């Protein structure tokens, strides 16, 4: 009988969590040109796919500790499954329903990322963080590959593929109850009283102030003061105080990398086109297919580099990755405007793959650095906060792309190339 160790079960569980949490996000972005058409900025789908997730992750540090993991799990399953059904079955010409479905799936993704990164705190860090990071990279690879094969190669209707994906979230429940081992130390809902005990030095000052206010105002109990506007204000200030040290070493470099790569992916790559007679026809039969292939190659690079930490590969200079990714933006922007420096799509395939390598390396090395450098008592909170960074970068890129993609397309049309206006739709 084949027996796997707890370490292997931990890695496998978090790999599945990462895979399932990100796969719908990837498939939705892969289907962007089908959902809104070639002449509409793909930034619409990108922003709908990320703003709800980003908003949730910004708000999560203020309340997520009070929600048990099992409730979070069932909530994200319901949100993601409902979202995919809405996207796939809504009428073709009613984009608003598709955007609502994307929004629900995005909320699920944000809840999942915060929750599973916090859950890694209770398991061996290399197995848990490495598994989740590899899983998120695997989601990009598997999701983009699945979508490319089913639509580009096999010719399935996009709405059918999206409807099939609605069953994926059930894997969260199966994995959580049947594969995930018991934690190294017990986790529980962190009520306010427990949070105060863990952060005694910071909270003692606030407790004393609350007691003084209670006595001076003749309030019957400290509990009434704790939930007053003044207490909430102090709690917010305390949370912001704990987030501030994370910004420069971890959050800023990850944010800038994501700005660069999503400007390329959703703003520039829809205009990185070549004559159909010069591309591999077994894989690409329309200009829409080129966009899908770019997405797969990017996700392939992400998967490989996100798995690198499990092989002992570490990059501690996080800002170096930011600089290298920005150079990629400049190269692809020049290519879109002047058709230089590449005269073959194969070189662009290689560049997009390299872009994915940088993005995945930035993600996994950032969270690995947090796990190594932040004290255990603050690590769970820090993981949740740093997870905001990638979403912030994507939101920023989406705002840029709203203008950039149309501008680049208009420049190409002005010089006689209208390929960016051609594609497919759902």
Curated annotation (Swiss-Prot):
Membrane topology: Multi-pass membrane protein
GO cellular component: fungal-type vacuole; vacuolar membrane; vacuole
Glycoprotein listed as a keyword: no
Segments crossing the lipid bilayer: 44-64, 67-87, 99-119, 129-149, 154-174, 243-263, 290-310, 318-338, 340-360, 384-404
GO biological process per UniProt: L-arginine transmembrane transport; lysine transport; regulation of intracellular pH
Matches recorded under InterPro entries: Battenin_disease_Cln3 (IPR003492), Battenin_disease_Cln3_subgr (IPR018460), MFS_trans_sf (IPR036259)
Keyword annotations from UniProtKB, A to Z: Amino-acid transport, Membrane, Signal, Transmembrane, Transmembrane helix, Transport, Vacuole
Subcellular location: Vacuole membrane
Pfam families named among the record's database cross-references: CLN3
Signal sequence region: 1-32
Function, in words: Involved in vacuolar transport and vacuole pH homeostasis. Also required for cytokinesis.
Family under the similarity heading: Belongs to the battenin family.
Protein name, per record: Protein BTN1
Species of provenance: Candida albicans (strain SC5314 / ATCC MYA-2876) (Yeast)
Gene it is expressed from: BTN1
């Amino acid at each position: 009988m084949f027996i796997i160790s707890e370490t292997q079960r931990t890695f496998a569980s978090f790999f599945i969590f990462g895979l399932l949490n990100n796969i719908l996000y990837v498939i939705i972005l892969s289907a962007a040109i089908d959902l809104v058409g070639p002449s509409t900025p793909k930034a619409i789908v990108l922003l709908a796919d990320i703003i709800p997730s980003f908003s949730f992750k910004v708000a999560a540090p203020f309340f997520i500790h009070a929600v048990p993991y099992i409730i979070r799990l069932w909530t994200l399953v319901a949100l993601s499954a409902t979202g995919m059904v809405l996207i796939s079955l809504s009428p073709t010409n009613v984009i608003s329903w598709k955007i609502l479905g994307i929004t629900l799936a995005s909320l699920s993704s944000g809840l999942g990322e915060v929750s599973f990164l916090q859950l890694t705190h209770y398991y061996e860090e290399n197995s848990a963080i490495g598994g989740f990071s590899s899983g998120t990279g695997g989601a990009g690879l598997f999701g983009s590959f699945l979508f490319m094969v089913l639509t580009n190669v096999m010719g399935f209707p996009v709405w059918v593929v999206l409807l099939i994906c609605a069953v994926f979230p059930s894997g969260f429940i199966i994995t959580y109850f049947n594969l995930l081992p018991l934690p190294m130390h017990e986790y529980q809902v962190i009520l306010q009283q427990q949070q105060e005990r863990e952060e005694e030095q910071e909270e003692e000052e606030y407790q004393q102030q609350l007691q003084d206010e209670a006595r001076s105002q003749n309030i019957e109990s400290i509990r009434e003061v704790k939930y007053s506007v003044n207490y909430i204000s102090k709690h917010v200030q305390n949370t912001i105080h704990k987030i501030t040290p994370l910004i420069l070493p971890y959050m800023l470099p990850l944010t800038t990398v994501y700005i660069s790569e999503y400007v390329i992916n959703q703003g520039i790559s829809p205009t990185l086109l070549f004559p159909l007679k010069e591309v591999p026809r077994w894989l690409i039969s329309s200009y829409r297919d080129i966009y899908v292939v770019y997405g797969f190659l990017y996700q392939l690079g992400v998967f490989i580099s996100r798995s690198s930490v499990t092989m002992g590969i570490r990059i501690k200079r996080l800002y170096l990755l930011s600089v290298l990714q920005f150079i990629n933006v400049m190269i692809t922007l020049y290519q879109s405007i002047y058709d230089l420096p590449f005269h073959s799509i194969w070189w662009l395939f290689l560049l997009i793959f390299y872009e994915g390598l940088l993005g995945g390396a930035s993600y996994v090395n950032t969270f690995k650095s947090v796990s190594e450098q932040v004290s255990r008592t603050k690590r769970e909170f820090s993981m949740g906060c740093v997870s905001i960074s990638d979403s912030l970068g994507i939101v920023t890129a989406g705002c840029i792309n709203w203008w950039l993609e149309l501008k680049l397309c208009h420049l190409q049309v002005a010089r006689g190339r209208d390929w960016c206006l051609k594609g497919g739709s759902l």
